[in-house]
Regions:
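Membrane-proximal, lumen/periplasm-facing interface regions of secretory-pathway glyco-
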Residues: 414-493, 508
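Short periplasmic/luminal acceptor-recognition loop of GT-C membrane glycosyltransferases, typified by
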Residues: 482, 486-531
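Short hydrophobic alpha-helices at membrane interfaces in multi-pass membrane enzymes
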Residues: 233-249, 291-295, 368-375
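Short acidic/glycine- and proline-prone juxtamembrane loop motifs at membrane-interface regions
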Residues: 211-219
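Membrane-interface alpha helices of multi-pass inner-membrane proteins
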Residues: 204-208, 241-256, 299-303, 375-381
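Transmembrane-helix motifs of polytopic, lipid-linked glycan transferases
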Residues: 169-190
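Membrane-interface transmembrane helices that cradle and orient dolichyl/undecaprenyl
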Residues: 225-241, 355-362
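Juxtamembrane membrane-water interface segments that cap and precede transmembrane helices
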Residues: 122, 132-142, 153-160, 315-346
Length: 534
């Protein structure tokens, strides 16, 4: 009892203290839970975005600017076209197939007429007729070169560098232009952006080795692409009835490849007639047959009359293509040799494999006209190497409808879903185009204020130092070969060379531009001489 009473007093005092503390403590209020929103009611409309510029909403796909927004395939197309431009500007200017052409225009500029004979070779005897096939392309090349010279200014080497740089820019522009037209032709023929882009990649792979050389042929390639664009419709349009004859008249005065266009049109016409004759027996009632026949007739008339030589122009063109000296001495005029070494024969074999794989797996039949095109141009590519250039554009064009059929059969695996047009993709395409320009050689001219050095812009085989030393022996900086300077000083008055230069056709092209006719250069244009001359 003595121990129990004090213990109870202590325990009661503790309970009394804790109870007072609990009574004096103020508890926080419980949080109030807001009711959940009613999902059954429509959401409140968002405020309209602030308009930018002249009242345009760049984030609205239904705005008036939406039709001008680009999609993913447009970005890829810009990349491929920009790649073609950049690549064309980065290639060396070749030492052949360019300088001699510009020299003829220089002569025409000085004499105000087209030459009726070889003006630079004293050995031309007239037995082989002189024909000016390249007037328009030569004029274009020469005046672009002159514009580059004037833009660069400075001494003669600096002006030469400016002229070469402008020619490289022209090469890039024509490459990009041809790629753009081919995309349009493939898109019109197959109505599929992915397949059209695939067709351009095929052209690029088949024609890659030819892209490196700037020559009048690039004009003909652009005309061929325009022809493919015109004939990619189900029926040739009325505008093409006027435009194609005009184009053939210009093409005939630009490059001898205009015959390729005529062959293509005739094969399409013959194939269409045969196809309808077997089906209906009345091919001439078909609009496509009528318009193709009219285009062929008008184009033959235009090209055969609007040239310096009249209808004999066709015979002159065929004679050039069968010149024995060209067929035996120039590599690209020879037939393909099938060997293990690298060459264009591999391009032909690879394309034949692709053709066989495509036509055997496609559900579409091959029209007779396309069969004729593949057979005739395939044989032509085997007999003459330079035909591979046209084969590279025609094969993808013929196969486009079959690739579209295969893509539709395996669409989940081959075709991406269509992209949504957007301003961001449009801006990305602009960035890609700007990047292509910044990688090109003219961007260096814009940034540095001067073109690429002449020796860096022309091929190593260009004998420009030799020509400059022969033309300016008195200048110390022109003395490229000390041995030649010693010989000129010892054996020639005023150190000026007199006589003729025996050069290969490749080397003679630039020497003719720089030295002829003051110093005659032999063996430059071998097609101007009778075979027994050699």
């Amino acid at each position: 009892m003595f121990l129990t009473q004090p213990f109870c007093q202590v325990l009661c005092s503790l309970i009394h203290v804790n109870t007072c503390d609990l009574e004096s403590y103020q508890f926080d209020e419980q949080p109030v839970m807001e009711p959940l929103p009613d999902r059954s009611s429509p959401p409140e409309p968002r405020p309209d975005p602030t308009a930018v510029g002249a009242g345009y909403d760049f984030s609205d796909q239904d705005s008036s600017l939406a039709p001008y927004y680009l999609q993913t395939h447009h970005i890829i197309a810009v990349f491929l076209v920009g790649f073609g431009f950049t690549l064309g500007t980065m290639f060396y200017l070749w030492h052949t197939d360019i300088w001699g052409h510009m020299r003829y225009v220089q002569w025409m500029h000085e004499n105000h007429r087209i030459p009726d004979g070889e003006p630079f070779s004293p050995w031309w005897d007239g037995r082989q007729p002189f024909t000016q096939f390249y007037t328009i392309s030569q004029l274009g090349l020469y005046y672009v070169y002159v514009a580059g010279e004037r833009l660069a200014g400075g001494d003669d080497v600096s002006r030469m560098a400016g002229g070469v740089e402008m020619l490289r820019v022209l090469h890039g522009i024509f490459t990009a232009l041809r790629f753009t037209i081919l995309i349009a032709a493939f898109l019109r023929f197959g109505r599929s952006w992915p397949v059209a882009l695939l067709g351009l990649v095929a052209v690029l792979l088949l024609d890659l080795s030819n892209l490196a050389v700037l020559r009048p042929q690039i004009f003909g390639q652009v005309f061929c692409a325009l022809l493919l664009l015109a004939i990619s419709r189900d029926v040739v349009s009325r505008r093409a009835l006027v435009g194609l004859p005009v184009m053939f008249a210009v093409w005939a005065n630009t490059h001898g490849s205009y015959l390729i266009g005529f062959i293509l049109l005739v094969l399409l016409l013959v194939g269409r007639i045969y196809e309808l004759a077997t089906l209906t027996g009345k091919p001439w009632r078909d609009y496509q047959v009528q318009r193709l026949a009219l285009v062929v007739a008008l184009s033959l008339t235009a090209a055969g009359t609007l040239n310096p030589y009249g209808p004999s122009y066709y015979q002159r063109t065929l004679a050039l293509g069968n010149h024995p000296s060209l067929l035996t001495a120039v590599g690209e005029w020879k037939s393909l040799t099938f060997e293990w070494a690298p060459g264009w024969h591999w391009i032909l074999l690879l394309s034949l494999i692709v053709i066989a794989a495509t036509v055997t797996t496609s559900r579409r039949s091959v029209p007779p006209a396309h069969v004729l095109i593949l057979i005739l141009f395939g044989i032509g590519a085997g007999l003459q190497t330079r035909m591979v250039i046209w084969w590279a554009m025609l094969v993808p064009w013929v196969l486009i409808p079959h690739w579209v059929d295969l893509a539709r059969r395996f669409e989940p695996y081959t075709l991406l879903p269509p992209g949504i047009p957007s301003l961001r993709k449009t801006m990305l395409a602009v960035v890609v185009a700007l990047a292509a320009f910044m990688w090109s050689t003219p961007a260096g001219w814009v940034i540095d204020g001067k073109p690429s050095a002449f020796e860096d812009a022309v091929s190593p085989g260009t004998p420009w130092r030799l020509a400059r030393q022969l033309k300016h022996p008195e200048e110390p900086d022109a003395a490229w070969l000390p041995e030649l300077a010693t010989i000129l000083q010892k054996n020639y008055p005023d150190r000026r060379f007199s006589g003729s230069i025996l050069a290969t056709p490749m080397q003679g092209d630039y020497l003719m531009w720089a030295l002829a006719p003051d110093i005659p250069v032999t063996y430059t244009h071998i097609h101007l001489f009778h075979p027994d001359f050699w």
